[in-house]
């Protein structure tokens, strides 16, 4: 049977694969689209397995919030390149997972990955099919469910790469969103100084002491220098100590006092944070594609 451009186009639309892959599959199955699909899925399962150890440092974050604004889920899904993250196939996959996360409100990633999709398929099967379509490894890295009875939820997402959820004790959604936006920009370690570990504080203090000794200044001056540097450090890593990004004349702590409320919780996801990208030489890169 003659393999026409129209036939190749139909197979591409159904499989989302490259033109040459579709043409080869149609030639191998004498132009039978259904058999070509089965063949491609079989071959792509093998190809997908080869992609599973590739580093996925790009991706998207997704936030979904319930109608009553008391439950919210935050999700990160990764790919190898930002080219794939912009594809309709990947975006649709992430959107589907976001809806499922809000529906099932999982407590951890393992629980989430065990949930069936609306068509009865497993998330893993859907992931393998996406890998086959886009030609890259895809990982569902993390998910978190946040619930509140009386708090005010604020959310903010920046360029689909940073997502933040906050809960205020009381107040309004605009303030909660402003705090989420601030956290997206500044990435604080925690809310208040009381939450910082003593080990972290002692380590920073030890560094400042050694640096100050080299100044050659009197001990009483050195002590003041250390106190000043520690205060600056604490303010820099705690949410309440940071200057508000929309008004640098006040801190988040003072802003909370002014609005008679408190930040009870926050979580921040940034695509690829904490993932170490392996360095490969050119030959390794080429061989990895085979």
UniProtKB/Swiss-Prot annotation:
InterPro entries: EF-Ts_dimer_sf, Transl_elong_EFTs/EF1B, Transl_elong_EFTs/EF1B_dimer, Transl_elong_Ts_CS, UBA-like_sf. NCBIfam families: tsf. This is Elongation factor Ts. Keywords: Cytoplasm, Elongation factor, Protein biosynthesis. Residues 81-84 are annotated as: Involved in Mg(2+) ion dislocation from EF-Tu. It is found in: Cytoplasm. Associates with the EF-Tu.GDP complex and induces the exchange of GDP to GTP. It remains bound to the aminoacyl-tRNA.EF-Tu.GTP complex up to the GTP hydrolysis stage on the ribosome. GO terms for molecular function: translation elongation factor activity. Belongs to the EF-Ts family. PANTHER family: ELONGATION FACTOR TS, ELONGATION FACTOR TS, MITOCHONDRIAL. Coiled coil: none annotated. Gene3D superfamilies: 1.10.286.20, DNA helicase RuvA subunit, C-terminal domain (1.10.8.10), Elongation factor Ts, dimerisation domain (3.30.479.20). Its main location: cytoplasm. PROSITE patterns: EF_TS_2. It comes from the Bacteria. GO terms for cellular component: cytoplasm.
């Amino acid at each position: 049977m003659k393999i026409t451009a129209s036939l190749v186009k139909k197979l591409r639309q159904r499989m989302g694969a490259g033109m040459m892959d579709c043409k080869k599959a149609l030639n191998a199955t004498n132009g039978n689209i259904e058999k070509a699909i089965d063949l491609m899925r079989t071959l792509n399962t093998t190809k997908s397995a080869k992609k599973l150890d590739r580093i996925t440092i790009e991706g998207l974050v997704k936030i979904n919030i319930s109608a009553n604004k008391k439950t919210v889920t935050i999700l990160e899904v990764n790919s190898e390149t930002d080219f794939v993250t912009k594809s309709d196939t990947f975006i649709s996959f992430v959107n589907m997972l976001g809806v499922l996360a809000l529906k099932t409100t999982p407590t951890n990633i393992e629980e989430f990955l065990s949930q069936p999709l609306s068509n009865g398929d497993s998330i893993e099967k859907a992931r393998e099919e996406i890998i086959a379509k886009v030609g890259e490894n895809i990982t569902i890295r993390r998910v978190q469910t946040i619930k509140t009875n009386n708090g005010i939820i604020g959310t903010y997402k920046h360029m689909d790469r940073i997502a933040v959820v906050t809960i205020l004790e009381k107040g309004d959604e605009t303030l909660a969103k402003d705090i989420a936006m601030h956290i997206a920009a500044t990435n604080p370690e925690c809310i208040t100084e009381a939450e910082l570990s003593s080990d972290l504080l002692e380590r920073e203090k030890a560094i400042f002491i050694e640096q100050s000794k080299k100044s050659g200044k009197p001990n009483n001056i050195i002590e003041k220098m250390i106190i000043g540097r520690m205060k600056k450090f604490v303010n820099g890593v705690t949410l309440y100590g940071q200057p508000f990004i929309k008004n640098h004349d006040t801190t988040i702590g003072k802003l909370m006092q002014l609005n008679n409320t408190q930040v009870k919780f926050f979580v921040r996801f940034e695509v690829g944070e904490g993932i170490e990208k392996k360095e490969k030489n050119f030959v390794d890169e080429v061989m990895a594609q085979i």
